[in-house]
Structures are given as structure tokens and as C-alpha cells.
Amino acid sequence: MKISTFLKASFLVVTLLLSNRGFSQDPNFYIFLCFGQSNMEGQGTVEAQDKKVNSRFQVLQSVNCSSLNRTKGKWYPAVPPLTRCWSGLSPADYFGRTMVENLPDSIRIGIINVSVAGCKIELYDKEGYTTYVASITETWLKNIIAEYNGNPYGYLVDMAKLAQKDGVIKGILLHQGESNTGDTQWPAKVKKIYNDLLNDLNLKSDSVPLLAGEVVHADQGGICASMNTIINRLPQSIPTSYVISSSKCTDANDNLHFNSAGYRELGKRYAKKMLQIMGYNGPLVGTEELMVAKDFSLEQNYPNPVSGETVIPFEIPTETFVSLKVFNNAGLEIKELAGKKYPAGKHTATFNARELLEGIYIYTLKTDDYTGSRKMIIEK
């Protein structure tokens, strides 16, 4: 009898161990939830430069897309579209690209995007969405909502729980407000949604911040730009929220949506803020400022990887003071390679890496009108 009981207990333990093998959460797989309306859904034209993506950046497919050969609930390389089958470029695209470009190679980034063009923030209210959905008259909007089983909030939570089996949720990205322009209760409504997400997914606000982007800015003629005043009040309601500026992010002819270049820049700004929240305050790769004069360039150093000396080429269109600094991956300055005026034209700077430890380093070129950074790999 004792032997039989022992065998049964042993069998139960082995069965439990085997059943748990399919659940393998990777702490180095950082997952970000994205939601909002059309600008987060993505309306930008996907161009050739957008179709090449680092394999460390992935998307959890939200809906079945035979046109993309993607199945709901599976991870894929994050080649746009990242939302639905026929959506376009969104801020999430260059958010993820910039994150993987600046984080260690051991870190992967995953995106879940459940966004609905034209919707009010009320669509994501856990309890109140039914009243809002019942008031909708536009067939196209009803059809989009139907793709998320009539409940985008619940759909996002279900997808997030699925993703939590694979990785760790590190943040929430929101871009919404055009359909709520003038609504002073918007910050309070967003706060409820944020708190509901934290509770339903067992998350803590101090480790899962909310990043909310401004709508098309007044400096681009944005027709909903007045909403940015309200959006910027969000941190007063949610201390762990951050507002991403849309100033100088270029837009489409409708002055409502960003164009592809605007989405790229806005996505990079989301990433820059997220990296800062994570404690990375050094120079960032792939976040060159928008106001770039013609013929400014910072090229890849050669050779790269490097063990001894390496050459860094750059070009400036006019005579100007140039700073060219090398930083370690923690953001500490290693050396200034320029620090003087240069005439217009092509130039090079030489850097001796013999005394440095192996790893990833960043070099940054700064002038009055340009900032650019690139990675350098040192191997011994």
C-alpha cells in the first residue's frame, strides 16, 4: 500500500512538472501594451525602410490576418502593420525599434496593439463601454470594434494575459484624444482605465508607467491641438504617467493624423522617455533630432567591431563647432574627440579603444543644429 501511494505521488509530481514546461516566462522579454484611436492604430504609409526589423522586436498578433500569414495570439517579427491586417505605420513601430537598438542584446521587446480608429476613450472603460458602443452609428467603427469581439478593453486584457506567459509587461502606451477634444474629464477617464488594467493584470504602477502622446501639434496646424492642454494634465491625475510631445512631428494633409515621418519621430520619443524611466540617461541611438540641416551626417565607425583604433566619419554643411563624444553603455563620457570648430565638408576622427573593456559604446555628434548617435562594439 505504501509503495502504491508513493508511486501515485511520484506520478503526480512528474505530471505537474511536465505540464509546466509550456509556461516559460522570460524576464528579458519586455512587453508593452498599446491602445488608443487611429494614430495609435497606425495610418502612416509603410515604406521600404520600415520593412526591415530586428528579430528582437516582435508583435503579438491581435487578429487573424491571412493576408499577412499571421494567426491571432502568436508572436511574429514586428514588420508593420502591428495592429490589424490593413492598418499602417504607428508610433509603436519606432518605439520598439528604438528600444531594441539601445537595450542589451539579451533584451527582447514585444508589442500588443489593440486600437480603434475614431473611438472615444469611453470605449476602453471596463464597465461603461457598452453604453458608448450602443450610441455608435457609424458602420465602419462598429466593424472595427467587432474585430475585438465588441469589447476592446477585455480583448486587450486577454491578449496581455497570454503575453504574460512569455514575458513581463513593462509599460502601457496610449495615443488617444482627438475624439475627446475639449473633454476636461479625459484625465480622470484615463486614470480609471489605467487602474483597471493594473488590477486585472496584477501589475504595479511603480513598475508599469503610462506614456501618453500628444495629438498633432499646433505647430503643424493640428485641428485637435487644443486637446494637448488637457492631455498634459494627465500626470496630475496619474503620478506614474508621462506625456510625449508631438511638437514638430510632421502630419498628413488632414491635420489630424501624422505622416510616416511623424510616426517614426513620435515613436522614438516614446522610447526615449521609456528608456529614461528605466534609468538609461546616456545618448541614444536612432533618436536624431528633427531639425537637421541638409548634409549633416554621422557615419558608422570602421572597423566595427574594434579592438584597437577606429575611424569615425562625419559631414557638416557649414563651418560650426562640433562635439564628438564617446560614452559607455551606462551613459558615462569616455572621451571628447572633437570639441572645436570645423569647416564645411567631410571629416574623420580617430578613437583608440585599446584600454577599454569589451562591450557596446555610443558615440554622439552634436552641433547647434544636429544631434546624432551610433553604436560602437569593442571586442578584445
What spans do the regions from the language model cover?
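Bacterial Sec-dependent N-terminal signal peptides
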Residues: 1-26, 287
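Generic extreme N-terminus detector
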Residues: 4-5, 231, 380
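Short alpha-helical segments used as structural interaction elements across diverse proteins
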Residues: 5, 18, 34, 371-372, ...
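Disordered, low-complexity tails and leader-like regions
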Residues: 7-10, 19, 224, 314, ...
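Generic structural signal for beta-strand residues in well-ordered domains
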Residues: 17, 25, 104, 165, ...
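Cell-envelope and extracellular/periplasmic
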Residues: 25-284
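C-terminal outer-membrane/trafficking sorting elements
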Residues: 289-302, 306-380
